């Protein structure tokens, strides 16, 4: 059974319930809804299918809402036709609302003319077209074409190494987040996060609605990389979004940045997802390239908690085959992981002094030393199982919670099998309930050795949630 989790993107393919069923049966842990495309009716329809699939399979697949984010795009063109840009020609970007042609096009960000200056590079359509700013005249950004090509309508625009003053959250993002709260999403992945303020703003929205949705920050530009530490500190997790990242910064820098992000997330005990083009050729072909297989494996070796499929499952020709291939790569790679090395890993100074982290580290070491089959982690919030997963035990982690939202959110935690449980009022009741439910569900059997770790409050504070993971007990299942 794989330990690394897999995020699958929903799309036209998953309008077919049978395909979504097959994805959920074959290893999809989180369903990603990309709000850069589609309308609410479309997303709600797929979410309803997902809810049906959860019930049919009794598998708590989580739902992740990926925001569109503050994007810069080109405008419409005359007759809707592409225009050809030639190297060396002059081409103008304008914030005025116009119909574009081979000499000029509209840009949807009204402040771009204030952010750029002569010498800045502007990339269009994933970097296929490159412009250099010659001068700025009012609303007009006059450029020279460095790399030409065919320019279509509404293409993405990147401005490397320039601080863009776009709002952290657009009005569309805010409406989408409200929709996500109402519909019961488990995660929000915030696109184009540049500073921690974006995450704080989203969390403020969620808090005001009493929502327990967790927030994943997508790192995909130079400013986000520069502010990585402060973003990790406030986010619940990070997505290494290599698509726009590979346009905003030199492509050859992406591998070491990916490793750095994964390392820092593991030190901080935060979830990390590696995404974009992992098995991209399987959108068209039934087999991946050797380079793609190696890419997935290396992300697992780096210590990622999850890997993600995008177009492969959303609209590719082989959605289920792509998932099965990713599962097989992950399982094969995990067979060669040195689990003992993780017990010597570096953690942040804050976590080094953290009681929960110390108890979880001791639980993993104990499970290894006595050859325990399971580490059982009852938790209201899923915090205990998250801390355990970062120590990468060879033993199976069973996360248990009375919260159905927490159970689904644990689906993104490395190595954690989430199971719903009754709430307990005492330590003995907690342990007895956990073992009873796991035995009745044939998850554990008589003779199994298990380490149980949890956060327990005193009797006087029994109606409060535990503030920390603070107990460990070893049990032999009767």
Predicted regions and their residues:
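Non-catalytic helical/linker scaffolds that mediate oligomerization, partner binding
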Residues: 1-478
């Amino acid at each position: 059974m794989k330990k690394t989790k897999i995020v699958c993107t929903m799309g036209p393919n998953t309008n077919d319930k049978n395909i979504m069923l097959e994805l959920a049966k074959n290893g999809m842990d989180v369903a990603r809804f990309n709000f850069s495309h589609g309308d609410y009716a479309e997303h709600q329809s797929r979410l309803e299918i997902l809810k049906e699939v959860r019930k049919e399979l009794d598998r708590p697949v989580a739902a992740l809402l990926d925001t569109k984010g503050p994007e810069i795009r080109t405008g419409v063109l005359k007759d809707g036709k592409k225009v050809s840009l030639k190297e060396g020609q002059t081409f103008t970007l304008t914030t005025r609302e116009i119909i574009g042609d081979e000499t000029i096009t509209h840009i949807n960000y009204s402040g771009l003319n204030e952010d750029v200056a002569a010498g800045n590079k502007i990339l269009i359509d994933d970097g296929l077209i490159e412009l250099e700013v010659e001068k700025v005249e009012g609303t007009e950004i006059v450029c020279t074409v460095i790399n030409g090509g065919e320019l279509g309508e509404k293409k993405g625009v990147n401005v490397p190494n320039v601080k863009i003053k776009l709002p952290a959250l657009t009005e569309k993002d805010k409406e989408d987040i409200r929709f996500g709260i109402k519909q019961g999403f488990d995660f929000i992945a915030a696109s184009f996060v540049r500073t921690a303020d974006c995450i704080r703003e989203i969390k403020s929205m969620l808090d005001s609605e009493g929502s327990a949705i967790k927030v994943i920050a997508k790192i995909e530009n130079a400013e986000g990389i520069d502010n990585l530490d402060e973003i990790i500190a406030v986010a619940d997790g990070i997505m290494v979004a290599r698509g726009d990242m590979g346009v905003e910064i030199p492509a050859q820098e992406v591998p070491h940045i990916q490793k750095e992000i994964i390392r820092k997330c593991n030190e901080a005990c935060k979830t990390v997802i590696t995404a974009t083009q992992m098995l991209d050729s399987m959108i068209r072909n039934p087999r991946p390239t050797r380079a793609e297989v190696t890419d997935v494996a290396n992300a697992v070796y780096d210590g990622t908690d999850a890997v993600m499929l995008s177009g492969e499952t959303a609209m590719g020709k082989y959605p289920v085959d792509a998932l099965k291939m990713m599962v097989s790569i992950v399982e094969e790679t995990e067979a060669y992981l040195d689990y003992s090395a993780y017990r010597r890993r570096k953690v942040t100074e804050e976590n080094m002094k953290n009681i929960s982290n110390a108890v979880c580290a001791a639980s993993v070491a104990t499970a290894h030393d006595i050859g325990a089959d399971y580490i059982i982690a009852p938790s209201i919030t899923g915090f205990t199982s998250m801390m355990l997963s970062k120590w990468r035990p060879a033993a199976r982690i069973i996360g248990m919670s009375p919260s159905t939202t927490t159970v689904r959110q644990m689906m993104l935690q490395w190595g954690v099998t989430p199971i719903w449980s009754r709430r307990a009022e005492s330590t003995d009741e907690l342990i007895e309930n956990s073992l009873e439910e796991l035995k009745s569900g044939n998850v554990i059997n008589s003779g199994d050795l298990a380490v149980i770790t949890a956060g327990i409050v005193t009797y006087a504070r029994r109606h409060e949630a535990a503030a920390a993971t603070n107990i460990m007990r070893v049990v032999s299942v009767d």
